[in-house]
Design a protein with these regions (language model features):
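Post-transcriptional modification and biogenesis factors for structured RNAs
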Residues: 1-139
Length: 139
């Protein structure tokens, strides 16, 4: 069973999650086909602050060298631990993540991300801003 988590949560839960990440460094944030450079830059900045790897899955809706990405990530973008894959299948073949380590964030997920059982090997997977995650990834 894949973890589909609800992203509509109170700030209190988000703060608790961030505090708990101290114990689980090296988690990975996966953005599947991100569309908005500012969002990716801001997520990259957060990854630097929390010592998380950022993984981008093509297609991207912008050039990764876009000034907007760097601007949103400000001076931190050069410190992002960044990996990129041509598509979801390449990512799966290369990383070989365990099913239990994959956490899929959806607007209408059934579970609170605060209650998930994260580990150092966890992959936090987010879809593109306008469409979310493709069904083939969630199946």
């Amino acid at each position: 069973m894949r973890h589909q988590l609800n992203t509509k949560l109170a700030c209190k839960e988000i703060k608790i999650l961030v505090r708990s990440i101290d114990e689980t460094k090296q988690m990975k944030v996966v953005l599947v086909a991100p569309e908005i450079p500012h969002n990716t830059g801001a997520i990259g900045r957060t990854c630097v602050a929390l010592d998380l790897e950022l993984i981008l899955i093509n297609p991207l809706g912008f050039d990764i060298d876009d000034a907007n990405v760097a601007r949103a990530g400000t001076r931190y973008w050069k410190y992002v631990n960044l990996s990129r894959y041509e598509n979801w299948l390449d990512f799966i073949k290369s990383r070989k993540p365990k099913r239990k380590d994959m956490f899929f964030f959806e607007e209408n997920g059934q579970n609170s991300f605060y209650k998930a059982d994260y580990s150092k090997e966890s992959y936090l997977v987010f879809g593109c801003e306008s469409k979310g995650l493709p069904h083939e990834i969630l199946e």
